[in-house]
């Protein structure tokens, strides 16, 4: 895969207030400021403007090897999937290998249950905005973010109202390394451009899906998650001069609860149209 990226940035920062912009030339409080007063003139300043121009031409090569095995023990069936994924990126001459394995267990129970466990190493090569620093320069030494993951799951298939339904549950833990930290300001995302943090994510996902309306699949899900990161070498001093290292702090993507519904129905009297 070939990637060609051209990037041009000219960025200004302006803080707007009532009748003037910040930073502004101070005036005496309570005085009337004429419209032609210098305090009403935009003063961008050196720290509120930057420009840059970047162009990169890189190559990526990916590949994988995977196999599957099926076996039985007593009345229980097992499906084992294993493999490894390879990735090379010419921008930083980085080669990664990601081994993964997944086991699915199908017990011969009266009720239709299945269980699974997955683990592996997952690499995520940085995309362009992650390797661009806040000042517009590119980090040619940036490395892929990666995680060690383990996930346990269960699946229950059943009938309700004589229609098929499925209830799934997943519990996971992910240890994150080489993170590229970022800040979120409304819709604006600013990446540090450095592998400057480690972190973790853990949670549980539950989903009920099925034909609430005959012939149409709908679903409802509930997720609980906690994710935090520890910035390398971050610290501050209290007014008393005491050194404080914050340790793990909440990531911008931390979302403790998420509840989602997707529901379909037919238009009364004309079933081909769905809502």
Whereabouts are the PLM-identified features?
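Outer-membrane beta-barrel transmembrane domain signature of Gram-negative proteins
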Residues: 1-77, 202
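Outer-membrane beta-barrel translocator domains and adjoining extracellular loop/strand segments
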Residues: 7-15, 92-98, 128-135, 179-188, ...
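Transmembrane beta-barrel outer-membrane domains
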Residues: 54-60, 92-96, 141-147, 187-189, ...
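Extracellular loop and loop/strand-boundary signature of outer-membrane beta-barrel proteins
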Residues: 47-54, 85-90, 134-141, 189-195, ...
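Membrane-embedded beta-barrel scaffold of Gram-negative outer-membrane proteins
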Residues: 108, 144-211, 223, 228-229
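Structural signature of Gram-negative outer-membrane beta-barrels, strongest in the C-terminal barrel
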Residues: 3, 50-174, 264
């Amino acid at each position: 895969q070939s990637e060609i990226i051209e990037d041009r940035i000219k960025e200004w920062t302006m803080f707007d207030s009532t009748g003037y912009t910040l930073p502004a030339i101070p005036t005496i409080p309570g005085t009337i400021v004429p419209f032609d007063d210098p305090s009403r003139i935009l003063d961008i300043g050196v720290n509120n403007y930057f420009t840059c121009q970047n162009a990169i031409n890189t190559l990526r090569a990916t590949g994988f090897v995977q196999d599957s095995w099926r076996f039985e023990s007593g009345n229980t069936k097992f499906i084992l999937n294993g493999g490894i994924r390879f990735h090379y990126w010419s921008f930083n001459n980085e080669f990664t290998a990601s081994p993964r394995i997944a086991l699915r267990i199908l017990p011969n129970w009266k009720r239709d249950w299945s269980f699974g466990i997955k683990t592996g190493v997952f690499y995520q090569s940085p995309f362009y905005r992650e390797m661009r620093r806040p000042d517009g320069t590119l980090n040619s030494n940036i490395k892929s973010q990666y995680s060690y993951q383990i996930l346990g799951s269960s699946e229950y298939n059943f009938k309700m109202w004589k229609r098929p339904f499925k209830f799934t549950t997943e519990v996971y833990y992910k240890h994150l390394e080489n993170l590229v930290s970022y800040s979120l300001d409304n819709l604006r995302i600013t990446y540090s451009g450095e592998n400057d943090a480690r972190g973790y994510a853990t949670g549980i996902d539950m989903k009920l899906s099925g034909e609430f309306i005959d012939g149409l699949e709908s679903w409802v899900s509930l997720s609980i998650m906690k994710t935090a990161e520890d910035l390398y070498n971050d610290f501050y001093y209290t007014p008393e001069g005491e050194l404080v290292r914050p340790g793990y702090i909440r990531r911008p993507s931390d979302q403790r609860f998420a509840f989602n519904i997707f529901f379909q129905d037919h238009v009364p009297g004309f079933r081909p149209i769905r809502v």
